[in-house]
């Protein structure tokens, strides 16, 4: 009986610890206007593609190059590259839906084929 009480107490302790850790790390979303004031720059543009507001930049002239970021990033991943490339190329950088200043997908689908379709519609 004593051993089962210890196990029960340990389970309750672990569960409460997890709840405290999880709730302590919850943060509110930063309002879009605050994000725009920090991350929008003179090259920033917005266009609606397939019902999604997409943040992109279009700089330079010449053969176009499209730069796409990875998971958890934005078009700013390419800031240093774009600075050099735009001297000889037209550089388009896109923030994919659900990241940075681009809006979310209303259907909440974020698969590769969805990004390919969005890119196809964008160009």
Question: Where are the language model's segments positioned?
Answer:
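Alpha/beta-hydrolase fold catalytic core
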Residues: 2-63, 88-89
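Conserved HGGG/HGGXW glycine-rich cap/lid loop of the alpha/beta-hydrolase fold
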Residues: 52, 57-101
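Active-site loop/oxyanion-hole signature of alpha/beta-hydrolase fold enzymes
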Residues: 49-50, 57, 96-123
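Alpha-helix termini
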Residues: 10, 64, 82-83, 108-113, ...
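Short amphipathic alpha-helical segments
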Residues: 4-5, 78-80, 104-105, 123
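Alpha-helical elements of Rossmann-like donor-binding domains used by nucleotide-donor carbohydrate transfer enzymes
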Residues: 42, 77-80, 84, 114-122
